[in-house]
Regions:
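A polyanion-binding, active-site-adjacent surface
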Residues: 2, 7-10, 14-26, 30-265
Length: 265
């Protein structure tokens, strides 16, 4: 008997045989498990998802934001009041994610004013414009034409950093536009240098790219200024760090800016 059991085990039989034959094909199928109860639904009186905002509602909201910005900027009689107005302005969502307001740096009565696009990570940390790698290159560019950061005035279209250094949206630019326009009016520079394509297109209200705008004198106008300001568009230092071969073109722009400052032409 022991030898028979051993043979069964060696053959792979690991269950005991029934005393009587069993027709397993004739067995009733196992009962199906009861269906799980559907997830509980909200009570009929519970609030559903918020209704979608209609496009016309968004447009009205944006116009109200722009109007609020225009009114706040117009009330600023000097640079300090404009900074306070921007600090109190809640119409741009970038303020919620930024660490600091990046307002401006340099001489607010300078003949030469630089306007970039938006702060980067280092600018956001320090609360000053153009202090990262691109800012260091801008400092060298200024030195090359006999200027320093203290001789000029530097700011941006946007005073708050977009998350992840992404490009600003049209809505964000529109919300901040009245403030940069008032900023330029209060500084009243002899020459306005628009740093990068976003700055140039925003301030001039055009769609041409920076490569078509650089290399020539332009004109910046404001309804609140007695006369237009001579303007120049240059490649952004951040772009020059990525494309150093373009530094020559920017150097030619800087030479013309210097000549204009020296001769008053």
């Amino acid at each position: 008997m022991a030898e028979l059991l051993k043979w069964y085990v060696d053959s792979g039989v690991d269950v005991a045989l029934e005393d009587a034959p069993v027709n397993r094909l004739d067995q009733a199928p196992p009962e199906a498990a009861p269906a799980s109860a559907p997830p509980a639904t909200e009570r009929s009186g519970a609030a559903g998802p918020p209704p979608r905002q209609r496009p016309d509602q968004k447009l009205v909201s944006r116009e109200e934001t722009h109007q609020s910005a225009r009114e706040a900027a117009a009330k600023a009689a000097n640079i300090e009041e404009l900074r306070a107005a921007l600090d109190a302005f809640d119409g741009c969502p970038l303020k919620e994610t930024a660490k600091n307001l990046v307002f401006g740096d340099g001489d607010p009565k300078a003949d030469l004013m630089f306007v970039g696009e938006a702060p980067g990570a280092e600018e956001d940390r320090q609360g000053l414009p153009f202090v990262g790698p691109a800012g260091h290159l801008l400092d060298k560019m200024l030195e090359a034409i006999g200027q320093s950061r203290g001789d000029v005035y530097i700011t941006n279209i946007l005073p708050w950093r977009p998350p992840g250094n992404r490009s600003p949206t049209d809505a964000e630019i529109a919300a901040c536009l009245p403030f940069i326009e008032r900023h330029i009016e209060l500084v009243g520079p002899k020459i306005l240098v628009m740093v990068g394509g976003t700055s140039a297109k925003t301030l001039l209200g055009i769609t041409q790219g920076i490569m078509r705008l650089r290399g020539k004198w332009l004109s910046y106008e404001s309804v609140h200024m007695a006369s237009p300001i001579e303007a120049r568009a240059i490649l952004h230092p951040a772009y020059l760090l990525r494309q150093p071969a373009q530094k020559r073109e920017t150097w030619l722009d800087l030479l013309e800016i210097r000549a204009n400052l020296e001769t008053g032409a």
